[in-house]
């Protein structure tokens, strides 16, 4: 199956402080979509083909599903943080999140990619920089 590898002052519009991440109900979806689009473009420039985005399966959501030229499915989690404090974007993919990603990926894989190898990557935006972690974790890590 799958394997291979401080608060700030209020904003100009009177918004409450958002901390050091990009969370916030009013902004989370558009901000997340923008980072997912940037991640997709980056991965496409590096030879991966787009398969699907924001796939909701029982147990979790897959931000991006891509395909390597050799046919391998790549399940991509996109994370963004303003700073690397508290571990940054990469560290925010903890064991609970990995477990949900694996559950969703197994369902997607069984419906759309059975027989293809697959892996889990993370594209992290931390303090304005993009980091691509290929084979960030495996199914037995979750």
Swiss-Prot record:
Residues 1-27 are annotated as: Disordered. Pfam families: UPF0102. Residues 1-19 have a biased composition (Low complexity). InterPro entries: Restrct_endonuc-II-like, tRNA_endonuc-like_dom_sf, UPF0102_YraN-like. GO terms for molecular function: nucleic acid binding. Belongs to the UPF0102 family. This is UPF0102 protein Bcen2424_0290. It comes from Burkholderia cenocepacia (strain HI2424).
